[in-house]
A protein has these predicted regions:
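Short hydrophobic alpha-helices and adjacent helix-cap/hinge residues
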Residues: 2-8, 12, 21-176
Length: 176
């Protein structure tokens, strides 16, 4: 005869085993973009952005690679403001509602034009497409030995009036 405590423990293990196996089977990309979402939020905490008025709008332009990772950030505080996630239609006029713009890889053909339009509007731009910082995007997220790193385009940030903390800039893998 099995003791009740041991029986409950065995039942709990049987119930959790499939969930643990499923978590192991999830694509690595989901973990990567969850980490990138957290990274973007942390960068935003150490950024001074023009035109903030109680809400900081993080826009995702193009195909959304984040899945549900960004939804967990909705409403989180950024100084005296709250973070709002927006999915604008394409085009430079859509950028006017953004404070931070993530440019998806699906928009890589238009990356330079989008970065230029966003800079003119005072919007912090972020992408994880290779070479994005050299095309005018302010922060290029890079996967470096399974860690998120970034390259920073200082000229683009200055042109937009975006200021990143020197503490953040010390972590940059490269500064242009």
């Amino acid at each position: 005869m099995m003791r009740p405590g041991l029986a409950r423990l065995l039942l709990l293990c049987c119930l959790l085993l499939p969930a643990a196996a499923q978590a192991q089977a999830q694509p690595q990309a989901a973990d990567e973009y969850a980490a990138k979402a957290a990274f973007i939020y942390n960068i935003a905490q150490f950024s001074t952005l023009p035109n903030m008025n109680g809400v900081v709008r993080l826009c995702v332009l193009g195909r959304d690679p984040f899945g549900s990772a960004l939804a967990t950030l909705e409403g989180k505080p950024l100084g005296n403001a709250r973070l709002s996630i927006v999915y604008p239609h394409s085009g430079p006029e859509a950028l006017m509602q953004c404070h931070i713009l993530y440019i998806s890889a699906s928009e890589s053909d238009d990356m330079t034009a989008l970065a230029d339009s966003a800079r003119a509007a005072g919007v912090l731009t972020i992408a994880d497409t290779r070479g994005a910082a050299r095309k005018g995007v302010m922060l290029e997220l890079v996967l470096d030995d399974r860690r998120i790193a970034f390259e920073f385009n200082g000229a683009a940030a200055r042109g937009a009036g975006v200021v990143l903390s020197s503490k953040v800039l010390r972590l940059a893998r490269a500064i242009y």
